[in-house]
From Swiss-Prot:
HAMAP family: Ribosomal_uL13
One function term, GO molecular function aspect: mRNA binding
Biological classification of the source: Bacteria, Pseudomonadati, Pseudomonadota, Gammaproteobacteria, Enterobacterales
A GO cellular component entry from the record: cytosolic large ribosomal subunit
Function (record text): This protein is one of the early assembly proteins of the 50S ribosomal subunit, although it is not seen to bind rRNA by itself. It is important during the early stages of 50S assembly.
Annotated Gene3D superfamilies: Ribosomal protein L13
Record protein name field: Large ribosomal subunit protein uL13
Subunit structure: Part of the 50S ribosomal subunit.
Designated gene of the protein: rplM
GO terms (BP aspect): negative regulation of translation; translation
């Protein structure tokens, strides 16, 4: 019996919608990363993108435990000398709430071209509206 390997052109991808209201950031991100990679499927193949599309709503209502709301700090660099910038979780939620979930999930995906392809299947929205109704996403309860 030969080992099964999924072919990129035969992979069936579903669309799911997830409500992030009250969900813990890390626990939500691990489940999203698992589904974006396709590890929940029987035909999972490490070198093929077998994951599903995921729409995350209400990113501004995601929860963190402990004092992380004020203590967790996100860093980025502008590219200029002395250009390191920082923002707390509260500031990130106020400015761009989608980035909090995107950063958490991106860190859990593989690095390289395959990981970037998986990350592109994640659609995060701060509010309760999305423009993917034509794909008929199923509700995913996490």
């Amino acid at each position: 019996m030969k080992t099964f390997t999924a072919k990129p052109e035969t992979v069936k991808r579903d669309w799911y919608v997830v409500d992030a209201t009250g969900k813990t950031l890390g626990r939500l991100a691990t489940e999203l990363a698992l589904r974006l990679r396709g590890k929940h499927k029987a035909e999972y193949t490490p070198h093929v993108d077998t994951g599903d599309y995921i729409i995350v709503l209400n990113a501004d209502k995601v929860a963190v435990t402990g004092n992380k709301r004020t203590d967790k700090v996100y860093y980025h660099h502008t590219g200029h000398i002395g250009g390191i910038k920082q923002a707390t979780f509260e500031e990130m939620i106020a400015r761009r709430p989608e980035r909090v979930i995107e950063i958490a999930v991106k860190g859990m995906l593989p690095k390289g071209p395959l990981g970037r392809a998986m990350f592109r299947k994640l659609k995060v929205y701060a509010g309760n509206e999305h423009n993917h109704a034509a794909q008929q996403p199923q509700v995913l309860d996490i």
